[in-house]
Amino acid sequence: MAQHAVYFPDAFLTQMREAMPSTLSFDEFISACQRPLRRSIRINTLKISVADFLALIAPYGWSLTPIPWCHEGFWIERDDEEALPLGSTAEHLSGLFYIQEASSMLPVAALFADDNHPQRVMDMAAAPGSKTTQIAARMGNRGAILANEFSASRVKVLHANISRCGIANTALTHFDGRVFGAALPEMFDAILLDAPCSGEGVVRKDPDALKNWSPESNLDIAATQRELLDSAFHALRPGGTLVYSTCTLNRQENEEVCLWLKETYADAVEFLPLDDLFPDADRALTPEGFLHVFPQIYDCEGFFVARLRKISSLPAMPAPGYKVGTFPFTPLKGREALHVTQAANAVGLLWDENLHLWQREKEVWLFPAEIESLIGKVRFSRLGIKLAESHNKGYRWQHEATIALACPTHAHAFELSAQEAEEWYRGRDIYPQTPPAADDVLVTFQRQPLGLAKRIGSRIKNSYPRELVRDGKLFTGNS
C-alpha cells in the first residue's frame, strides 16, 4: 500500500516519543501514520442481519475482514470503487450499512460492554451520526437517544444519516454540551462524549491534520474537554455508564482529562477497565484500564476510549439561564390517534408503544416515549420522526417515516427489479411489466422500503425526495 507524506511538527514527535509505551515501536508508529487508512463499514442491524448482508453482497466480490471490537463492523476492499463509490451503492442508499472508521466503533462497543440496556442515552457530540446510528442499532430502535451537535451546519447532516438508517428513537439538539449537566441533571442511563479534540489520530485520513497543531492548543482543548466531561457526568444518573473518547493521542486530552474527573469527584467516579472488550484489547490498555490506541497496534486510526460508572449522586449545578419557550406540539390521543394509526397501518407503517403520537397544526409526529420527560427542559432542533401531514383526503405520509417504520412484507409492498430501483433513485417514475393492484404502493428493493408511492394507471409515480435523487451508476454489477 502506497505511503503519503504526513506533516509532523517536531514538538509533536517529541511528545509522542514520551507518551508511547516502551512495548511499541516509534518507527512503526511513523510508518503506520503514513499508510492510507483501511476502508471500513458497519452493517446496520436495524435493517438487516450480519448473515443476511453477507449473503446479499456475496456475488459482488467485496472482500470483508471482521473488526474484532464490533460484530457488525468490517474492513472492506473493492475492485470497483472508481466506477461505483461505496456511498452510491444501493445498499448504502437504503441504509443497510454506514461507512465508519473502525476505531470510531470502539466507543459504542465500550458503552454497551457489559450487555447493559440503557433506556435513555445521550450522544453529546453526535455529528455526522456514525455513533448515534450505532447506538440506535444496539438499542434496537427502542428507548431514546438525545443526539446533540454544537455545529449548526452539521445538524442537517446528522439528521440525514439518522433518517437514511431508519432510526425513530432520536431527538436532536443544538447546544454547547456544557449546558446539559445543569439543564438535565442525572437524566441519562448512559452518555457518550466523543469529545472535540486536536485530531492527532486522523493523519492517515488527513495528512495535513497537524498543520495548526501546537502543545498550547492541546492544553486549551483539554480545558474545554474537562468542562464537557463535567457536564456529561452531572447529566448521568447514579449507576449510569459514561464513555469518554477522542481521536487524538496525547495524554493531556485523554488520560489526564479522565484523571481530573476522578480527582474532582473521587467518591462518585469508578473507572471500568476495558481489557476484555475484545480479544487482544490488552495491547492498547493503559494502567487505568483505558484504551489508548496508537495506529500501528490494530492498523487503524489513533483513538482513545475510557469507560466509567457514576457510583453516587452529585450536588446540582446552577440552573441554566436560558428560556426554553413554548412547546408547539400536543399529544394525539383517543379517536384521533386511533384514526391515524389505522390509516398508517393500512399502508404498511407500523410502530409500538415506544413511540407516541403528537400533533402540530396539520403535522403528525412520533416521539420516543422515553424523551417526553425532557420536554420543557431543553429546546429540540428535531424530535422523533415526522409521520404525516393531514389534508382533506387523508394523510401525506413522510419519507423518513416510511424508511423507519414500513413493513416490507405488507400486502401493498411492491418489489422492484434492480433496473427499476435504479430508476427510482434517479427520481423517475416506474413502469413495471405487471403493475401493482393497489393504488397506495410500498416500493421495496432487496426487501427494504424505498418509499410510499401512488399507482396512476400502469405507472408508479416517484415520491423519492428531490434532495436525495442520484444519478450515474448506482448498483454493483450493473452496466
UniProtKB/Swiss-Prot annotation:
Name of the top EC class for this enzyme: transferase
Organism for this UniProt entry: Salmonella agona (strain SL483)
GO MF, any single term: RNA binding
Top-level lineage group: Bacteria
Catalytic residues as annotated in Swiss-Prot or TrEMBL: 247
Family membership noted in the UniProt record: Belongs to the class I-like SAM-binding methyltransferase superfamily. RsmB/NOP family.
Main location: cytoplasm
Cellular location(s): Cytoplasm
Record EC number: 2.1.1.178
SUPFAM superfamilies associated with the record: S-adenosyl-L-methionine-dependent methyltransferases (SSF53335)
Positions that bind S-adenosyl-L-methionine: 125-131, 149, 176, 194
PROSITE patterns linked: NOL1_NOP2_SUN (PS01153), SAM_MT_RSMB_NOP (PS51686)
CDD domains (UniProt xref): AdoMet_MTases (cd02440)
Keywords for this protein: Cytoplasm, Methyltransferase, RNA-binding, rRNA processing, S-adenosyl-L-methionine, Transferase
Pfam families: Methyltr_RsmB-F (PF01189), Methyltr_RsmF_N (PF17125), Methyltranf_PUA (PF13636), YebU_pre-PUA_dom (PF21150)
Recorded catalytic activity of this chain's protein: cytidine(1407) in 16S rRNA + S-adenosyl-L-methionine = 5-methylcytidine(1407) in 16S rRNA + S-adenosyl-L-homocysteine + H(+)
Role played: Specifically methylates the cytosine at position 1407 (m5C1407) of 16S rRNA.
Protein name in the entry: Ribosomal RNA small subunit methyltransferase F
GO cellular component: cytoplasm
Coiled coil recorded as keyword: no
GO biological process: rRNA base methylation
InterPro entries assigned: Methyltr_RsmF_N, MeTrfase_RsmB-F_NOP2_cat, MeTrfase_RsmB-F_NOP2_dom, Nol1_Nop2_Fmu_2, Nop2p, RCMT, rRNA_ssu_MeTfrase_F, RsmB/NOL1/NOP2-like_CS
